[in-house]
């Protein structure tokens, strides 16, 4: 069974026009927040010799690196990552004993 007539109506066809965008898409600031948190925790880990701060800085820096876009400033992200790695290395060079959780000092 073959239809020879086209069931569509040519006079009812309209070309699609996307609606005009009045607002810019919201920026995701997770990368910036994690970058700042990573730097703060890195400095706390370096200055106060807190290993858990240094490890939290590595965690925040890797989240910042994972969520970064190609257009983001890579120098800032890499420097934050290197600062957090150096905080971990320096905290373990000063005291090579395993890390104790922060709440362990509250019970003694």
UniProtKB/Swiss-Prot annotation:
Spell out the Pfam families in the cross-references: ASTER
Q: Where is the composition biased (Basic and acidic residues)?
A: 1-16
> Which keywords does this Swiss-Prot/TrEMBL entry list?
Membrane, Transmembrane, Transmembrane helix
- What are its GO biological-process terms? protein insertion into ER membrane
MF terms from GO for this chain are:
protein folding chaperone
Q: Where are the transmembrane segments?
A: 77-93
Membrane topology term: Single-pass membrane protein
| Gene Ontology CC | endoplasmic reticulum membrane
Q: Which compartments is it annotated to reside in?
A: Membrane
Q: Where is this region: Disordered?
A: 1-27
Would you identify the family this protein belongs to, as annotated?
Belongs to the Asterix family.
- In its UniProt entry, what is this protein called? Protein Asterix
Source organism per UniProt: Manduca sexta
């Amino acid at each position: 069974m073959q239809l020879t007539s086209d069931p569509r109506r040519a006079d009812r066809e309209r070309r699609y026009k996307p609606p005009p965008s009045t607002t810019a898409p919201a920026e995701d600031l997770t990368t910036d927040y994690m970058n700042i948190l990573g730097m703060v925790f890195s400095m706390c880990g370096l200055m106060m010799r807190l290993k858990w701060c240094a490890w939290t800085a590595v965690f925040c820096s890797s989240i910042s690196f994972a969520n970064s876009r190609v257009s983001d400033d890579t120098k800032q992200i890499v420097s934050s990552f290197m600062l957090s790695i150096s905080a971990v290395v320096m905290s373990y060079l000063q005291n090579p004993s395993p890390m104790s959780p922060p709440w362990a000092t509250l019970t003694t």
